[in-house]
Regions:
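Conserved hydrophobic/aromatic beta-strand scaffold that supports enzyme active sites
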Residues: 25-29, 47, 69, 77-79
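Short, well-structured hydrophobic secondary-structure segments
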Residues: 28-43, 48
């Protein structure tokens, strides 16, 4: 279902562009210095794509005592796997897209032929 649900946040604005049981697609505007809550998603991946600005993603790893910090600029993408606490903050005024999707079976492909190069 395509909606245009726009909501103000303490850090800026989020707008749900697409939401259905398989994927969610949100446009976010994050003001410089804006930071979301530390949170996790039990079953969904959370992807971030930056259109303009700079978004800093902190991921608090479950498998070891470490916090990964990644700074995304225009054209950069990263994802956070389900169950990992994370947050984002904007080092500059930022426009980005958040994509959410469930963990699906990664071995979903059934090949009938093998790829090749033709002369």
């Amino acid at each position: 279902m395509c909606i245009r649900d726009r909501a103000g946040k303490v850090w800026g604005v989020t707008e749900a562009l697409l939401q259905n049981p398989v994927v969610e697609f949100h446009r976010i505007e994050v003001n410089k210095g804006g930071e979301c809550s530390t949170h996790k998603h039990a079953h969904k991946w959370n992807g971030f794509f930056v259109e303009e600005g700079e978004l800093e993603i902190h991921v608090f790893k479950n498998d070891y005592d470490l916090t990964d910090k990644t700074i995304l600029g225009p054209g950069d993408f990263m994802s956070v796997k389900p169950g990992e606490y994370h947050l984002f903050k904007a080092n500059k005024n930022t426009i980005a897209f958040e994509i959410y999707w469930p963990e699906l079976l990664s071995e979903d492909i059934q090949r009938k032929s093998v790829g090749k190069m033709n002369a």
